[in-house]
UniProtKB/Swiss-Prot annotation:
Keyword Disulfide bond: yes
Molecular-function GO terms, alphabetical: serine-type endopeptidase inhibitor activity
Descriptive protein name: Trypsin inhibitor 2
Marked site positions, Reactive bond: R5, I6
Main localization category: secreted
Coiled coil: none
A Pfam family it matches: Squash
Length: 29
């Protein structure tokens, strides 16, 4: 919830915008 719908690659939750977590597919969501 509250995660901007922007495709962002990540390795960890802190790579993502506020409200997002790093998913298993390597993208924030």
């Amino acid at each position: 919830r509250g995660c901007p719908r922007i495709l962002m690659r990540c390795k960890r939750d802190s790579d993502c915008l506020a409200g997002c977590v790093c998913q298993k597919n390597g993208y924030c969501g």
